Amino acid sequence: MPQITLVFISLSGNTLSFVKRLSLYLADNYDYHVKQINIKDLKHETFPVKEEFVAILPTYLEGGNGVDSGDVEILTTPLGEFIAAHGNAQRCLGIIGSGNKNFNHQYCLTAKQYAKRFGFPLLGDFELRGTPDDISRLAQVIMEASSRHSSNDTQTLPNS
């Protein structure tokens, strides 16, 4: 059975709810075993992730408007520290952001900043707890990212 790891942080329960439903969807529809790592449970510990993973990050910002007056990430920085440690960023297939569209330009801004900071793609986004359509859409995106990564690993260069 193939496996995918979801590394996330959930503070209000919205992201945890989404990850649980996404995990069930991946298991039921793609026969994937999903390993979940909730950074909140680690109490600022880090360790090397040996397998490929997808990061899922809610948006918690302080100050600014996300366009011209800056912003400061709050509460979710342990996920960034975890990704930065032990070369974990190299095993991240990409990031999914969550947020509240009422915050306009700040919607999923932290995930966009992580994608730029670490050099992996922003795979998608969802609002608050996410909808069933978000679950199926992002499950497909995860499967495509995992397939691309797997095919890149198995490709060999021709002899020159």
From Swiss-Prot:
- For this entry, list what GO says about its biological process: protein modification process
Q: Which Gene3D superfamilies match?
A: 3.40.50.360
Q: Domain of life, per the record? A: Bacteria
For this protein, the record's InterPro entries field holds: Flavoprotein-like_sf (IPR029039), RNR_NrdI (IPR004465)
Q: Name one Pfam family in it.
A: Flavodoxin_NdrI
Return the protein name.
Putative NrdI-like protein
Do you know which SUPFAM superfamilies this protein is assigned to? Flavoproteins
- Tell me one GO molecular function of this protein: FMN binding
Tell me the protein family, please. Answer: Belongs to the NrdI family.
